[in-house]
Amino acid sequence: MVESIVEKCVEQVHNRFKLVLLASQRTHDLSTGASDPVEMVKFKDHKDTIVSLYEIAEKKVNTHELFNLLVKRCKEHMKGNTDNTYINSPSKLANLLNFSDHQLNTSLDVSQESHDDEIDDQDSGEEVPI
């Protein structure tokens, strides 16, 4: 049953990754009580994930609306996390913003030199431990 539902879902939402995101958003809506299943009687004993996939496969829910809800929820989550991180410690943000080009170039030069040494070791016939 689940395989046929997923196949029908892929016909509606061609990107499998987007399908997973949409199904998770719909499942979240059902689990939190934000909305009721479209056909409550038919899926009385089924898990919310199966109901979500069925609704997407049968076009019972608007996928554009689901996607917009998902984006909104992600933005709210990210806003909450970033505000807490940098409000409590403004020096962390200042350090990130004051990262100089010189520091970046120095770290790139060091990594390039170590890469060049590995190539030289390979040319000499010695095995390089990984």
Swiss-Prot record:
Gene Ontology BP terms: DNA-templated transcription
Uppermost EC category: transferase
EC number: 2.7.7.6
Keyword Oxidoreductase: no
Keywords: DNA-directed RNA polymerase, Nucleotidyltransferase, Transcription, Transferase
Catalytic activity annotation: RNA(n) + a ribonucleoside 5'-triphosphate = RNA(n+1) + diphosphate
InterPro entries: DNA-dir_RNA_pol_omega, Pol_omega/Rpo6/RPB6, RPB6/omega-like_sf
Region (Disordered), start-end ranges: 107-130
Self-association state and partner proteins as the record states: The RNAP catalytic core consists of 2 alpha, 1 beta, 1 beta' and 1 omega subunit. When a sigma factor is associated with the core the holoenzyme is formed, which can initiate transcription.
Protein name per its UniProtKB record: DNA-directed RNA polymerase subunit omega
Species of the source: Wolbachia pipientis subsp. Culex pipiens (strain wPip)
Taxonomic placement: Bacteria, Pseudomonadati, Pseudomonadota, Alphaproteobacteria, Rickettsiales
Name of encoding gene: rpoZ
